[in-house]
From Swiss-Prot:
Keywords: Cytoplasm, Endonuclease, Hydrolase, Metal-binding, Nuclease, Ribosome biogenesis, rRNA processing, Zinc. Single strand-specific metallo-endoribonuclease involved in late-stage 70S ribosome quality control and in maturation of the 3' terminus of the 16S rRNA. Its EC number is 3.1.-.-. One of its GO terms (molecular function) is zinc ion binding. Its cofactor is Zn(2+). Zn(2+) binds at H125, H129, H135. It comes from Brevibacillus brevis (strain 47 / JCM 6285 / NBRC 100599). Binds 1 zinc ion. It is found in: Cytoplasm. GO terms for cellular component: cytoplasm. This is Endoribonuclease YbeY. Disulfide bonds: none annotated. The gene is ybeY. It comes from the Bacteria. Belongs to the endoribonuclease YbeY family.
Amino acid sequence: MLSVEILHEEIEPIDENLQNLLVRCLEAAAKLEEVQGEVVVTLVNNERIHELNRDYRGVDRPTDVLSFAMNEPGEGEMEIFIDEDEASEFPNMLGDIIISVPKAHEQAEDYGHSFERELGFLTVHGFLHLLGYDHGTPEEEKEMFSRQEKVLEEIGLTR
């Protein structure tokens, strides 16, 4: 099972239908990847994601989505090992996904598809990053984007 919390930071909350769409996207991706755990999705404005992108990635501009995986130790952090028998006592906190709502609107218009489709795409994209997928090479990109499309097609968010 996947536990999802949706937060709004410095923006008006999105409606309940869109929140349910995000949960459906994450549940479908978790099922495809056979993973359980907890995810927090925070919806923000361009100023906030710009700040986070600058502070954590050293990129001084807004972006569409950021992912902060909790299962990967950060620079200078110790890796924590838990006995397999005890692991079930702790929640599997997968991480945080931060999405710029204004960027999602802008990109939906640029790509000629719905805001819902773009928001779903960014949600699944961020989730796959939490699981370690990347798109730094053509092979990685092909793998990641094919998984994204599979999830989006499954829930009816086609182009």
